[in-house]
Each structure stands twice: as C-alpha cells, then as structure tokens.
C-alpha cells in the first residue's frame, strides 16, 4: 500500500478531501500533503552520487515509481558507460504498472536485479487499494518481465511484496495462490522467487487487528484453505502467514468498532472523490465494517 510519504499525488488527493470534508478534518486536523524534495531533478544530488561510482556494489532505486524517473535511467546508463554495471546489484520496489522496454533493456546490464513487486491484491482488490491501477495491465507487465528474465544473462530475485491490511486480508489466500502459480510456472536457473509481505499498522483503522469476528472467520477460512506447498515455496512467507493467522484468531481490540467507523469515513470520502464504490471492487466489503 502506497502512503503519502512516497506519493505526492496521494498526499494532494487526501489533502483536497480534508479541506472540504468535516469528518475527514476531525480525523486529520493537520495537512496530509507532505513537503516534496524533487531529488530526481536536483543536479547537485546526481553530481554528488557520481563521486561514489567506483565504490558502488548495491544501488537502491526509488521514486515514486522508479521505472518512471528519468534520472534513474540516466544514472544507470552512466554506470554502464563507465564499465562498472556488471559488478553492481540494483534493487527497487515497483508497482508493476509501467514496464517500458527501455527499463527492461537497461537492467540487463547489471550483475543482479532485485525487484520487490508491490502488488496488494488480485483483481478488483488490487485496483481499489492501488487505484487507478488496472489488473490486466499488471498481469501483462509481469508476463513481459518474465519473458525478459527467461532470456537474460544476469540474475534476478523477484519478491511479491503485498501490504496486508483489513481491506485485503480476505483476499490474501487468492494472492498467495496467484503468486505461487506464476512462480511455479516460471522457474529459471537465473531466477529466485520469494514473498515478503508487510502488515499495515497505519492508519491504525486499516490494521487487521480491528476486524469483526465475522470478517475474521471469513479470512481465516480462506487462508487455511491455502495449500502448504504454496506457502513453503516462498522462504519468507511462512512466519508472516502464521502471524496473520494468530492475529485473526485473537480477541479483537476494545476500540475496534470506533476504528471501523473511521475506516468507513476514510473509504467513503475517497470513493466520493474518485467517483467509485468499494462494492464494485471488493466483494466482501460489507463484512469489513460489521
């Protein structure tokens, strides 16, 4: 799940809601629009970074979306031009919404590429949480990436990186199955798969800790249906999976109802701004609120 710290567009959107919505103002009395340092267009930043080129072993690319930042391409090309790229590992998170051919071409020049695939659900769940992403486009981009990896001469580490919240925990079983099917069907000598999920704790009302008993049971039933082989395939998944099961089986928090009311205000406000309805994206949405 992207946050206002990493997305200036989301920050601007939420701030525009806050300014006109009294319920939203009560939840967030202070601005939700964070100051933005335009580092990608700061020539001093890139000039300072170039001084370290002889010593670079691993470089972590950021964004917004790293595949859209021209400065990233320019710097990677410089590493290629000076002949050091074959000794460097590049690592970054991508929302998989935009895989340009130039991106695929340039990463092939590096020793290893570590990509964390920031996809938070399947189908409409992904499209709602990561609005305005399109599920079909994400699937097409993953296929494009895997076709490139298959014929590549360098090594790849691909890790699914969902952020699990009250919105998508009942979709996590489908997510695991979908991820496993992709990984199982695309096993190459130069490719290592993993899943490294995180749990959403903020805003607090999105934490699964505040789920209703009914919604917890729905999520538990689905998660316990996941085959063991699908979980064990990903080295980093088992402990997280157990953590989610334990949380869902625990007694829910005393302030859960109040947090669910805040969640509904949040979702309704964003839906109105975006002219969408959560019911059209998340089939179990009514069970979330209780």
Q: Predicted regions span which residues?
A:
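Core AdoMet radical
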Residues: 2-41, 53-69, 82-101, 108-140, ...
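Eukaryotic beta-rich interaction modules
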Residues: 39-45, 76-78
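Catalytic domains of carbohydrate-active enzymes, especially glycoside hydrolases
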Residues: 48-52
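Surface-exposed alpha-helical interface segments used for non-catalytic interactions
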Residues: 70, 74-77, 136, 177
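Distinct, well-ordered alpha-helical segments
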Residues: 73-76, 100-107, 171-173
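Amphipathic alpha-helical interaction motifs in eukaryotic regulatory proteins
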Residues: 76-77, 127, 143
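Short, acidic, metal-binding catalytic loop of nucleotide-sugar glycosyltransferases
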Residues: 78-84, 148
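Conserved C-terminal portion of the radical SAM core fold
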Residues: 91, 110-116, 136-289
């Amino acid at each position: 799940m992207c946050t206002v710290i990493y997305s200036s567009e989301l920050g601007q959107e939420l701030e525009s809601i806050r300014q006109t919505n009294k319920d939203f103002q009560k939840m967030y009395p202070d601005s939700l629009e964070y100051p933005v340092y335009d580092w990608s267009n700061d020539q001093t930043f890139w000039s300072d970074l170039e001084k370290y080129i002889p010593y670079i072993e691993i470089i972590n690319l950021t964004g917004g979306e790293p595949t859209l930042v021209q400065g990233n391409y320019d710097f990677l090309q410089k590493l290629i031009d000076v002949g050091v790229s074959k000794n460097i590992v590049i690592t970054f998170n991508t929302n998989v919404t935009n895989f340009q051919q130039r991106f695929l071409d340039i990463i092939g020049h590096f020793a290893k590429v570590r990509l964390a695939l920031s996809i938070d659900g399947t189908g409409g769940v992904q499209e709602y949480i990561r609005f305005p992403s399109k599920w079909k486009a994400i699937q097409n981009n993953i296929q494009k990436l895997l076709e490139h990896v298959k014929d590549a001469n360098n090594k790849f580490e691909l890790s699914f990186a969902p952020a699990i919240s009250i919105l998508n925990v009942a979709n996590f079983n489908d997510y695991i199955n979908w991820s496993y099917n992709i990984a199982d069907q695309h096993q190459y000598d130069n490719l290592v798969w993993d899943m490294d999920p995180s749990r959403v704790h903020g805003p607090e009302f999105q934490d699964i800790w505040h789920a209703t008993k009914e919604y917890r049971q729905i999520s538990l039933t689905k998660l316990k249906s996941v085959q063991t082989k699908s979980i064990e395939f990903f080295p980093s998944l088992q402990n997280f999976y157990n953590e989610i099961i334990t949380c869902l089986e625990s007694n829910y928090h005393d302030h859960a109802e109040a947090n669910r009311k805040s969640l509904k205000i949040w979702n309704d406000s964003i839906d109105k701004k975006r002219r969408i309805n959560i019911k059209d994206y998340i089939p179990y949405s009514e069970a979330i609120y209780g």
